[in-house]
Amino acid sequence: MTRYVCISLAVLLLIPGAFAQQSFRVEKDLLGEKQIPANAYYGVQTARALENFPISGVLINHYPGFVEAWAIVKLAAAQANTDVGAMKPEKLATIEKACQAVRGGKYHDQFLVDWYQGGAGTSTNMNANEVLANIALELTGHKKGEYQFVDPHDDLNMSQSTNDTYPTAIKVAFLLRNDKLIEEMQKLVASFRAKGDAYLEIVKMGRTEMQDAVPMTVGQEFHAFAAGLEAEIQLLHDAEKYLYPVNMGATAIGTGINVPKGYPEKCAEHLAKLTGKPIVPASDMLAATWDQQGFVAYSAALKSLAVKLSKISSDLILLTSGPRAGLFEINLPPLQPGSSIMPGKVNPVMPEVMNIVAFRVMGNDQSVGLAAHHGQLQLNAYEPLAGLAVIESQALIYYTSILFRTKCVDGITVNEKTLEHYMETTVGIVTALNPIIGYEKSTELAGEAYKSGKGILEIIREKKILTEQQIKELLDPVKLTGLDRSKYEKKPQQ
């Protein structure tokens, strides 16, 4: 329903007489004149995009970081143009005020074009140009549409093309949010570490291929979850470097037509200052204008993280299964009734939604790959899809991880009696007897245990294979886990 409301409102804004008190201004482009709502900050090209692409209802302002990124790119471009003498300082001052207003969260409701669009992102670039130009006009006492004073093309798009601003804005959007994503992953790691410390010496059975294997501790299991996520954090750091090179100054195809000398370097320099990231000009502008390596690499890192989160979530779902006819090794916080027909049922909704998000991220990564390889010749026209896929993946993982941590992981408890029962009745500890009585005799013991339903320890005592002292020394559950407590001790900060 939301989709159709968004589309309908966007289109209604363009229909004369749709609202009784609505007034309009007239703007024109190469296709002719068009009425634009007088209070709209966008212009004629945005209006055409609203008519041409009422597709998903997911507008570019759905992700505020993307709108903020456009303001940063346009500000850096204006600053660079001023540095090289192409723009007057007075005009820069006006454009800077407009860009800073958008960076501060204002006027985002004017960034209305749909993410799904043809034209390699031209609709989005012009939406940004027109809105920022009209904000600048108002700030200097002019009316919207008086482009002889501040022009969307000549001023906001000076020394630029959609083909360099669009990929750069997407990269900036990713960079602005990557630190937050990493910070949240670090919090999730800390939560798993805390659970690992709390249950460090609680022994349980490890399983391979869903069958009992050898003993481990609950703490080891949770610390392993944390270690796995730490590897993904490093991958996010590593992937970020592929977002640093930008093709600002490439303009249409990478040859830099209409670009003043020194502009690419100055633009990257200003982008670095505005973002706090080491952004640099791409070494080959022609390649950078069609090459999607940055999107592919960062999307791959997000996919890898999603795979890890999904695996951990699936483990939690298994470990909490039951409560009477499943593993029931851990308890997850009960969040909501789980069934409209089965009384008392509570489902593991947080791990499940993490699975769902992970599946979406994996699908998005596939879309990024398809978009990346399908661009023809000197430009990739499918960057809007790649950009949306990655920015959505980034946001989904970030927000879901907050919920997963606070509503699930932080509240996990362990059913120690269940684990004790499993350890008493398991056949898994028979592996520890291999060095003592050999593999064949150990196998015979395991077979007897399965047939009789007895535990290994019970059979060992019946057959007097080991003395009680030997059992204590050789089959101590904690010793069998190989637990190295020093591995998990917090190191004092230097």
Stretches with model-predicted labels:
Residues 1-5:
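Positively charged n-region of N-terminal signal peptides that target proteins for export
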Residues 6-17:
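Bacterial N-terminal signal peptides
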Residues 21-494:
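Conserved, well-structured ligand/cofactor-binding cores
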